[in-house]
Amino acid sequence: MTDDTTKNGPDATAADAAADAAAYVENDIAQEEAPQPDALELLKAENGELRDRYLRLAAEMDNLRRRTEREVKDAKSYSVAGFARDMLAVSDNLRRALDAIPAEVKDAADAGLSTLIEGVEMTERAMLSALERHGVRKLEPVGQKFDPNFHQAMFEVPNPDVPNNTVVQVVQAGFSIGERVLRPAMVGVAKGGPKAAEAETNSVFDEKDA
C-alpha cells in the first residue's frame, strides 16, 4: 500500500514535471546551439529571386510590346488590301482600254481623242502612284526564276537561251503589299533551256529592298 502511494502520489507528479522541464530546457538549448541562417545570405537569395522575377516580367513586357507593334503595323499595312485589289481591277480596265486603241488610230487622232487618251493615261498613273504611297508595289518578275508564291504561270515559251522556268513575259502585272502578295503576276515561262542553277535565291521582297 505504501509503495503504491509513493509511485502514484505527489512525488511522482513532481518527478514528471521535473522531467518535462528538463526536456524543455534541453530542446531550447539545442535550438539555440543549432546554426542560424545568415541574414546576408537570406537577403542575397531574396534579391536573386526578385531579380529573376523582374527579368521574366521585363521579357514578357518586351514580347508584348513587339507583338503589339507588329499587329498595329500589319493593321495599317493590310487594312487597305481589299480596296487596293478593287483599284487594281479598275487600273487593269484602263490599261485594256488604252491597249485596245490601234496605233494608227492614236497617230491620226484629233485633238479631242488625243486629250481623252492622255486623260486615261494620267488617271492610270495617278491611281498606281496613290497605291504605291500606301505600300502597294508592282512586281517585276521578268528574268527571275519562276516562283509560285509570286507568279502564276499561264503558258510556256520555248527558249533555249535562258534557264528553264525563267519568267520571260508578263501577261498581267502582279503587286505586293507589305510583305504579302496582293496579286500574283500572270507570266509566261521559258522551257527548253539549261537547267536552272540550284542556288538559294532571295525573295522578291529582299530584292526590292536591296
Curated annotation (Swiss-Prot):
Coiled-coil residues: none
Example GO BP: protein folding
A GO molecular function held by the record: adenyl-nucleotide exchange factor activity
Transmembrane feature ranges: none
Keywords from the named record: Chaperone, Cytoplasm, Stress response
Chief location: cytoplasm
Keyword hit for Transmembrane: no
Pfam families (alphabetical): GrpE (PF01025)
Matches recorded under Gene3D superfamilies: 3.90.20.20, Head domain of nucleotide exchange factor GrpE
Record-linked PANTHER family: GRPE PROTEIN, GRPE PROTEIN HOMOLOG, MITOCHONDRIAL
Function: Participates actively in the response to hyperosmotic and heat shock by preventing the aggregation of stress-denatured proteins, in association with DnaK and GrpE. It is the nucleotide exchange factor for DnaK and may function as a thermosensor. Unfolded proteins bind initially to DnaJ; upon interaction with the DnaJ-bound protein, DnaK hydrolyzes its bound ATP, resulting in the formation of a stable complex. GrpE releases ADP from DnaK; ATP binding to DnaK triggers the release of the substrate protein, thus completing the reaction cycle.
Name of this chain's protein: Protein GrpE
Origin species: Rhizobium leguminosarum bv. trifolii (strain WSM2304)
